[in-house]
């Protein structure tokens, strides 16, 4: 039995204002039973006693007449790779919006050629539990953050865009503390200006 509970948040700044701020939750489970070369699945977005019992009965019906052996020799290799931080809750919505506005102002101040800036945050926290038929319970918590900046520059009627982003299964602070976000803006701007100064490749004859 595999159970998953996920909550996520996306905040987008575009054209000098917050374009959208979305929050969503998703949960569900999946049953899997294997007997010989026969595999049966059952899943639902509703986690309740009734739903779990129905799924269990469906699996039993699918594997009726089949007999399997429970494998107790599987070794526990689980390791804790991520911290317990919740990116969705670690900072208030206001503080995230304030940082996005700082990013917007900084990127626009890099050069007069900067005409448009888009920046967004994505935060996610996923909780997972796996219950094996022998009663063994395994669980994991997986944070995820993503931070992207897009800079559009214009010169002599020509427009080019540079996009750069960072992310990983850790806290926002890794990318935002000590104004580390400026490095992301600088790289997006560098890519945009490099594209702006580029020349067309020679055409074949």
For each of these PLM feature ranges, what is it?
Residues 1-205:
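Active-site bordering "gate/hinge" segments
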């Amino acid at each position: 039995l595999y159970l998953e509970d996920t909550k996520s948040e996306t905040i987008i700044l575009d054209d000098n204002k917050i374009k959208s701020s979305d929050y969503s939750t998703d949960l569900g489970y999946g049953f899997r039973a294997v007997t010989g070369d026969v595999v049966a699945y059952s899943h639902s977005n509703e986690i309740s006693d009734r739903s779990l019992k129905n799924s269990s009965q469906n699996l039993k019906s699918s594997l009726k007449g089949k007999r399997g052996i429970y494998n107790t020799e599987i070794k526990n290799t689980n390791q804790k790779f991520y911290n317990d931080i919740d990116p969705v809750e670690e900072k208030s919505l206001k503080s995230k919006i304030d940082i996005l506005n700082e990013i917007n102002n900084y990127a626009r101040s890099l050069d007069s050629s900067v005409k448009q800036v888009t920046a967004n945050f994505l935060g996610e926290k996923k909780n997972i539990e796996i219950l094996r038929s022998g009663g063994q319970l395994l669980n994991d918590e997986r944070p995820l953050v993503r931070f992207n900046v897009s800079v559009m520059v214009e010169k002599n009627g020509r427009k080019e865009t540079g996009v750069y982003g960072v992310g990983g299964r850790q806290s926002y602070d890794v990318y935002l503390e000590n104004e580390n976000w400026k490095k992301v803006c600088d790289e997006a701007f560098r890519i945009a200006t490099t594209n702006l100064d580029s020349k067309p490749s020679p055409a074949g004859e």
